[in-house]
């Protein structure tokens, strides 16, 4: 369902125009959504023309040196608040989400990840401080109704992994924007819940832990999850997501070498010219 160039192509081009020290990680940031408006708010960052006919805006976004790629399901013929499973990338299904996760991350090699899902029936921007390697889950829509429990066999059952997003910076900037959102960090024991929000959120933290070494060619600096309130309209959600992305990029910039504009434009050109349907 996704459109993306093989990251090996990107890295090869990258190495032609920047120093070897800066060639060991991608300049790609991955964002994911589920139920509306978390899919619609990131639509312009999809490189799939079927989902984003107006064109991908993620290449060297705002001249900040990073390509932003969004992946999310669609819900044709459905109306909320119960949107169902959906179709496409990251359907609201445990097995589909996990399979898509490992496939897409192997192609994107994200240097940072933000996963999003629908939250409470309010105007909240809820930054999750952690996600849990749960041993019990709320059933999804189709058999098998639950995932492997726990999903991560390398980590303590029911153990927590911590977000590596710049959580307080995100909250402060969203509040300062005057969007009418209640932005806060959720530090509760419940973490991201017992459904797909927690599941994909945990996958993000799990992936980042695997690729946390700066010597890893798929080095991932930061990952975390945000719940978006049901009452948040798509325009407001989009603005808050972009604010969150800017804060994430500042965190990544403080950690990784700067490739320079020439390197990023080379990457973006190859992405645009060599996308393939998967």
Task: Please annotate each region the language model reported.
Residues 1-10:
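Bacterial N-terminal signal peptides that target proteins for export
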């Amino acid at each position: 369902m996704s459109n993306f160039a093989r990251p090996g192509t990107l890295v090869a081009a990258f190495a032609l125009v920047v120093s070897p020290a800066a060639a060991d990680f991608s300049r790609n940031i991955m964002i994911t959504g589920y139920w509306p408006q978390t899919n619609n708010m990131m639509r312009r960052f999809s490189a799939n023309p079927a989902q984003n006919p107006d064109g991908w805006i993620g290449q060297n976004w705002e001249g900040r040196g990073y390509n932003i790629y969004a992946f999310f399901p669609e819900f044709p013929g459905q109306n909320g608040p119960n949107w169902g499973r959906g179709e496409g990338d990251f359907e609201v299904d445990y097995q589909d989400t996990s399979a898509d996760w490992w496939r897409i991350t192997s192609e994107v090699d994200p240097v940072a990840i933000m996963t999003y899902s629908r939250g409470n029936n309010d105007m909240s921007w809820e930054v999750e401080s952690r996600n849990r390697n749960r041993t019990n889950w709320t059933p999804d829509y189709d058999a098998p109704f639950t995932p492997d429990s726990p999903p991560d066999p390398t980590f303590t059952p029911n153990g927590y992994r911590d977000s590596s997003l710049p959580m307080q910076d995100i909250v402060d900037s969203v509040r300062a924007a005057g969007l009418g959102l209640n932005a806060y960090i959720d530090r509760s024991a419940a973490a991201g819940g017992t459904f797909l929000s927690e599941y994909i959120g945990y996958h993000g933290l799990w992936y980042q832990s695997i690729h946390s070494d700066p010597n890893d060619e798929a080095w991932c600096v930061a990952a975390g999850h945000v719940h978006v309130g049901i009452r948040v309209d798509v325009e407001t959600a989009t603005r808050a997501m972009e604010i969150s992305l800017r804060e994430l990029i500042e965190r990544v910039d403080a950690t990784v070498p700067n490739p320079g504009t020439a390197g990023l434009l080379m990457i973006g050109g190859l992405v645009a010219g060599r996308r393939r349907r998967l």
